[in-house]
Amino acid sequence: MTAVIALVGRPNVGKSTFFNRLTRTREALVADLPGLTRDRHYGTAQFEGRQYLVVDTGGFEPEEREGLVAAMAAQTRLAITEADAICFLVDAKEGLSTQDAEIAQELRRGGKPIYLVVNKMDAKGAVSELPEFYRLGLGTPYTISAAHGHGVEPLLEAIFSDLPTSEDDTADAARKGPRIAMLGRPNVGKSTLVNTMLGEKRVLVFDEPGTTRDSIRIPYERQGKPYVMIDTAGMRRRARVGEGLEKLSVLKTLSALREADVVLLVLDARLGIAEQDAHLVGVAVELGRPIVVVVNKWDGMTPEERKAVKQELERRLDFIRYAPVYTISALHGTGVGDLYKSIDQLWIDSRRHFSTAELNRALADVIETHQPPMVGGRRIKLRYCHQGGENPITLVFHGNQLTRLPGTYKRYLESAFRRALHLEAVPLRLVFRQGENPYDPQPKNGRQH
């Protein structure tokens, strides 16, 4: 799984600055998802080729004699229990405080790797305060300037030298077959489905609402084919959790989704689709992961109830109408075997490579059927297409006035290329680049407009 590094410390010690320093060169994992991208307290970063997630837990502010009892918000508790490493930031300019000592005591109880980070070492008079921090009992401090980047690289080297790499047996197995992320709210039958798909009775869990844990990766074989199951903790109802728990749950979900080749979204037919379900789908879509919608507990429902569920699926999940939908009973195994047909096909399709010639033949047919619209008296030109990546399959279009291409025509392109390339069930990512075809031998002044 992608490592999670939590930034902990009292207010105004520079956590946000350090967060920005770590994440400055990386785009957010999710684009345009309300409640996610606007939350600037988490992000993705990279160090020496290893991607990781970083979360700013906010500041501790113990209140009078209650100490950390009141100040330890859900987000910070989750940082301690779910992070792989904790960077405990203190302020070299202000020196050691009572709050620092209280935080250090609480962090030690968590048993996670703690890196004491003395920030603002570039401040005047900071060096004279450094010896104080040894009294926290957390070993030799790492001195940095989050604002200017001094000392950050040695700190990250220390953290990642202690963290295990993901290149283990599970990763080796995953390269031979699909990695399946099992997502869903608690009590929808997710763990029962995992057990049924694995073909054995085993406890995977701690799946009760409110319980938090790391995702579990389970390599296994079915009919001679290798798979890896990534079982994540279920998403919680917002009313039952604090902001921080929701945040860390999202982090773990993002981590699982980054690793997955195929995502199974498990729904309870009797509970319908909650906001968290649609939210999970949105995350998977933004990451470009193929999705299979699995409607569990289908047995025992009346025809009228089944019709209502199908209508709700069409309405709430309209933006992934390409995704296959299966109705199953995880408890009795009904329909579970059919899931593998889609899993295997989606894994193959999402990794396909198309030649540039094939894509441009398809583009010519698509344009002949329906030309781009006229804008300002000139027709938008789609001149050239090539593949820019896989999982998700990314198609890069070059042409003129592409910034003015309407959304309706972009949707037409997506559906038309799905049909032409026989990619009906996997996400397609379309990228539009303004300019000339770099592979066209004709000079620019020989263009026909």
UniProtKB/Swiss-Prot annotation:
Domain KH-like: 352-436
Binding annotation for GTP 2: 184-191, 231-235, 296-299
Keyword entries, A-Z: GTP-binding, Nucleotide-binding, Repeat, Ribosome biogenesis
GO function term, MF aspect, one: ribosome binding
Binding site for GTP 1: 9-16, 56-60, 119-122
Chain ranges of the EngA-type G domain: 3-167, 178-351
InterPro entries named in the record: G_ENGA, GTP-bd, GTPase_Der, KH_dom-like, KH_dom-like_a/b, P-loop_NTPase, Small_GTP-bd
GO biological process, one term: ribosome biogenesis
SUBUNIT field: Associates with the 50S ribosomal subunit.
Family: Belongs to the TRAFAC class TrmE-Era-EngA-EngB-Septin-like GTPase superfamily. EngA (Der) GTPase family.
Its job: GTPase that plays an essential role in the late steps of ribosome biogenesis.
UniProt name for this protein: GTPase Der
